[in-house]
Amino acid sequence: MAVSRRRGPQAGAQSFFCALLLSFSQFVGSDGMGGDAAAPGAAGTQAELPHRRFEYKYSFKGPHLVQSDGTVPFWAHAGNAIPSADQIRIAPSLKSQRGSVWTKTKAAFENWEVEVTFRVTGRGRIGADGLAIWYTENQGLDGPVFGSADMWNGVGIFFDSFDNDGKKNNPAIVVVGNNGQINYDHQNDGATQALASCQRDFRNKPYPVRAKITYYQKTLTVMINNGFTPDKNDYEFCAKVENMVIPTQGHFGISAATGGLADDHDVLSFLTFQLTEPGKEPPTPEKDISEKEKEKYQEEFEHFQQELDKKKEEFQKGHPDLQGQPADDIFESIGDRELRQVFEGQNRIHLEIKQLNRQLDMILDEQRRYVSSLTEEISRRGAGTPGQPGQVSQQELDTVVRTQLEILRQVNEMKNSMRETMRLVSGVQHPGSAGVYETTQHFMDIKEHLHIVKRDIDSLAQRSMSSNEKPKCPDLPAFPSCLSTVHFVIFIVVQTVLFIGYIMYRTQQEAAAKKFF
């Protein structure tokens, strides 16, 4: 089970301003606004990332997913699950179906991360019932909770597609913990037992939906890729549970179920990583395999090598005209290389803005929790609950609530400005049909929106320092000496001039070429 930590309203407001200022300094102080936000050491304020080790015994992905006997290596499937060469259909689109797959051995990881790629497809606008990702002490091969057993000891992340309580809050992603003694509340979609949740539509997407679930330092974080783009790293924040206590050893699993309505629940991959905190020694690799297994693997390798050689000979005999011919267009031209470099620079700016937007989402979610806790406290005081010595007065609570609401409004305005900037950057990345003037106008709009974001953050900082409490934030880290503001502005101007000159040169060449036709 998990217990969420509640901090005081004053500490919450102070931590919000500190985190907001530090995130903006990281955004401005990165290498040309294009540093990889996920790379260790990309900014001075960013913590060192943990060491990741891939665990193949707790993972699967296609192709060649199943063996000749229809089983998945290191995994056990039950119910109506159907393994195939490139995916596992956990539950087919038939009524009242259940299926699940579980690891055969228990994992003993202190910190871990799983990346799951799946599809949920159906004919109707409403689907049922949903899919669940598990980490439990024992396998739940069959049961009423999305195809798995009830009263589990561990945590389940539910992708619930059917609205049982009629509140029109589905599809939703719900994190539910259990200590092995609680029955799941089906009628209310687990709302009374949810530790965290978010509303995301994961049905009938053009690309597979991806979920990244991280358990690190007793904090469970769920990130979602909605499947609108082919970008595998386009994750957004969904839910976070702090002080999450789970079994030290457990099985990973996936289950799904259908009811009166039915969807196809397909899992394309399940990748597990063991995380090691910085400074600790990474886990030692397993011992060498036995001689018998080595001989077996060597025989399989030789067999596959012979088949590959035969396929090569057959292809060469069937396509003799392709032998010895050099491939065309191997090397890119100078113009293509320059255009590619411009697009890569714009893409880095786009990714940096998305990273800042993701951080603002997490801060906004935390502030909503603070406002909710303060509202409950005010309601209890209004009902006549006697106060305790040392607690703040009603007027102070009202002031803090008003401040929090104003902060939420400011953050929403900043998010809207960031979305507009991302839209303009996306327009710049496809300038094939636009002229020089339109391209220049896009650059000016992007610059204007970035100034708006900076001004909003400065106003929030000044407002916080003008209050009576005057919260003290940590000193901002020094900007890197490798690149100053003047150099950065000169670089942007030179890049813009070169890009406009290239577009004008290309337009003149095309106009000159048209004279011959």
From Swiss-Prot:
Chain coiled-coil ranges: none
Site (Required for ER export): Q508
Disulfide cysteine pairs (residue numbers): C198-C238
Region (Mediates interaction with RAB3GAP1, RAB3GAP2 and UBXN6): 506-517
Binding site for a carbohydrate: S96, D129, N164, H186, G259, G260, L261
Positions bound to Ca(2+) 1: D160, F162, N164, D189
Topological domains annotated Lumenal: 31-484
Amino acid composition bias (Basic and acidic residues), ranges on this chain: 278-297
Transmembrane feature ranges: 485-505
Pfam families: Lectin_leg-like (PF03388)
Location of the L-type lectin-like domain: 52-275
Assembly, per entry: Exists both as a covalent disulfide-linked homohexamer, and a complex of three disulfide-linked dimers non-covalently kept together. Interacts with MCFD2. May interact with TMEM115. Interacts with RAB3GAP1 and RAB3GAP2. Interacts with UBXN6. Interacts with SERPINA1/alpha1-antitrypsin. Interacts with BET1.
Protein name (record): Protein ERGIC-53
Native organism: Rattus norvegicus (Rat)
Lineage: Eukaryota, Metazoa, Chordata, Craniata, Vertebrata
Gene assigned in the entry: Lman1
